[in-house]
């Protein structure tokens, strides 16, 4: 049976979707059967894996609100399976207010296919609202990308408080699996200081492999492919391959 991970940080621009796309694809390259659930209305993980809007007949929105079986919405790609998102998801938080088990609709859907995958990632939106709450209730563990920049730790206390609340009241199995340091520039004292500070706050939980600031990482999404397929020799590709190996060993 596979393991469900929510990739979450309520701050935008921290490399959350970049990590979701490239870590999922790198684990797929290592032979794991992966499913990436794009639960962000911006749908950047969907487009980042080459799935165009016109190709999407059913999305995660249809699964959680229209009763579409999750298998009917999954798209098979060369980089692993994807449960695509769409802009319709932006209104889902309001529509879920009157739903039964509203915090668990995503979990209920994903449980139908959980045994078919080694790893399922949920790319949560950059907020701590209903969609992210669904991601946290569905997951067994969370992965938190943290950028090595000013205010990196800002807001993480809110995220960890939410994690504790969900664990206490809704999902007792939920754990912090690991923290991924992103946008790291080893040439600067500042990046190194931030990395040290994050490791101090999360002892034993920060992955040894860090993700550098890298032009190829920024360019790959516009081509609809993971960085390993865009430029396999880039520092970004090497970093995500090494992170995937570390991640797999920790499973």
Features from the language model and the residues they span:
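P-loop NTP-binding core
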Residues: 1-251
